[in-house]
């Protein structure tokens, strides 16, 4: 009604082993979102997390995939790291990046959170448009046209669930 899309991410999305214990199955859970999302922490290079969300977005007619990224990357995570992580995820189908994080205040434990805030508290904040302008252009290209998918992969989570159950 107001033009807002519901988005978010699930817990323990990456593997067949992690999904049954945490949420049952990521693919079915993505149906609840108008923009399926993932949470890719630690600057890891995961294949399945982004591809599951992209597949769900295609199947359910969603306009793209959201990712919360850069979390748990530490204070020495530089612009090269930001670009590499964003490019990796774009190659796997992520079209909307939600950077983790910007502080309201550096008071208390916030000053020890990581990565460094993407906000005015960081000395490089005025230079950050170099990174964001790149992704603005890239995501404009990625959201034009329609995907032509000619390959199907069976997601075997039901078989995993039946064999191992929720507690094993």
Language-model segment annotations:
Residues 1-168:
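Carbohydrate-binding surfaces of carbohydrate-active enzymes
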């Amino acid at each position: 009604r107001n033009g807002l899309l519901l988005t978010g991410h699930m817990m323990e999305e990456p593997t067949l082993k992690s999904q049954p214990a945490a949420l049952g199955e990521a693919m079915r859970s993505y149906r609840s979102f108008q923009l399926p999302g993932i949470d890719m922490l630690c600057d890891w290079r995961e294949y399945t997390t982004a591809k599951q969300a992209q597949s769900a977005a295609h199947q359910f007619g969603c306009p793209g995939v959201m990712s919360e990224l850069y979390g748990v990357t530490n204070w020495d995570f530089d612009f090269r790291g930001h670009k590499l992580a964003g490019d990796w995820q774009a190659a796997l189908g992520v079209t909307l990046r939600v950077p983790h994080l910007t502080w309201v205040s550096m008071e208390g434990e916030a000053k020890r959170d990581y990565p460094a805030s993407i906000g005015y508290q960081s000395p490089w904040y005025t230079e950050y448009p170099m990174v964001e302008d790149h992704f603005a252009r890239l995501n404009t290209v990625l959201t034009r046209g329609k995907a032509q998918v000619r390959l199907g992969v069976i997601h075997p989570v039901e078989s995993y669930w039946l064999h191992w159950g929720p507690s094993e």
